[in-house]
Amino acid sequence: MTPSWPPTPADVARLLEALALAEERSPHYRARFAAAGFRVTELRDYDAVRARVPRTAKADLVAAQRAHPPFGDFLAAFPSELAAVHVSPGPLYIPRLADEPGGTPVLREAIGAMGVRRGEVAHVTLSYHVMPGGLRLHRAFEEYGCVVLNGGTGASALQLQVARDLGATVYAGTPSFLGRLADQARELGWDPRRDLHYRLGFSTAEALPQVLRAELEGAFGLELFDHCGEALIGPVAGECRLHAGMHLHARDLFCEFLDLATGEPVEPGGTGELVATHLGRRALPLVRYAPGDVYRLRVGDCGCGNPAPRVDFVGQVGTIRKVRGVLVHAAQVARVVAEFPELGRFQVVIEHPAGERYERATLRAGLVREAPTDLVGRLARRLKETVLLDLGVALVAEAEIPEDAGPPRYAGAMVDRRTH
């Protein structure tokens, strides 16, 4: 989705430019387009692109890089031209040219939309180890004009000491690590609001349910801004000061939101799967890449004046199941689970036992601390209020829940044991 929808001729021209570059420089896309029976010069409008250009899945990149290591046949540049390589789970290798921004221009815009001032100290706590997130944010804050504290993950007591000494006023990282910093501060005998100086927070990589947002904002006295992205795509969307949905970053991406059943573009108010094409990326361009993320498009314009469409992250294809006629989203369940500090990872197990009339869904919630006696009842009530379905609840040790069932993607959170 671009700032206008349907896309304007200028939007489509940029999209066709990106497709032509991929066809010319990437052996994978050149062969794939030929196999689909078209040349990019034959495409005239968005409808033709949607009808003829196949989607790219993460599995395509994994297979290509295994068959032709290290970068597969997607690479659209000579290896000697590369300036950096990042890694995404898979593992997948993400190369970048020296003059490719890697998402930093849109991140700088997002930082400005939060009200960050040049010269402020920004504390970046995403991982700098192999993954691209920490370095991307670091570069964006630095280029914006901030003093950057490269905290990374772990060593929370040391990070608190340094953040206090430097007077860090901007936090950037996951909401769960910010919560860990609050707990650590209290263990040190500090009051997070009094002894630390955070006033703004760039929350990313995990869901930010309203209950958790309120808890963290209350603990630190800061204002949190929700942002989303994907390692291969880069930044996708972020909140403005009105907190009325996340604005799409349309500078570097042509984003489509397609109905899960029909593949047709959804209208504002609808829910669809993200399909993204890089505009201008030359090392490893992705064409109609579908990471499996599902978004709801908001209706109307934002009062902040930014014309870019607004979205809310719903969940992932594969993390949404229909149970007794109700769509159950792993991300929706995650927001409820996040309200209970006793709980960590979870799974929703869906069954239709032989001889029983109705399907059954049970939440297996992993305990990370001792549970009060009324936890099961309170959790079941909140689930029904939010999911609009009665879910059974079973408390288990968190070690019994696989790691891929946790944030940020909840890939293993939905276990469907029905035989259809």
For each predicted feature, which ranges?
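Conserved beta-strand termini and adjacent loop/short-helix elements that scaffold enzyme active sites
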Residues: 151, 227-229, 258, 351, ...
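Conserved AMP-binding/adenylate-forming
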Residues: 199, 208, 212-301
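Active-site phosphate/ATP/adenylate-binding loop shared across adenylate-forming ligases
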Residues: 48-219, 225, 233, 237, ...
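Nucleotide 5′-phosphate-binding alpha/beta core
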Residues: 1-113, 117, 355-364, 370-404, ...
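Structured loop/turn residues at beta-strand edges in well-structured enzyme cores
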Residues: 13, 166, 196, 222, ...
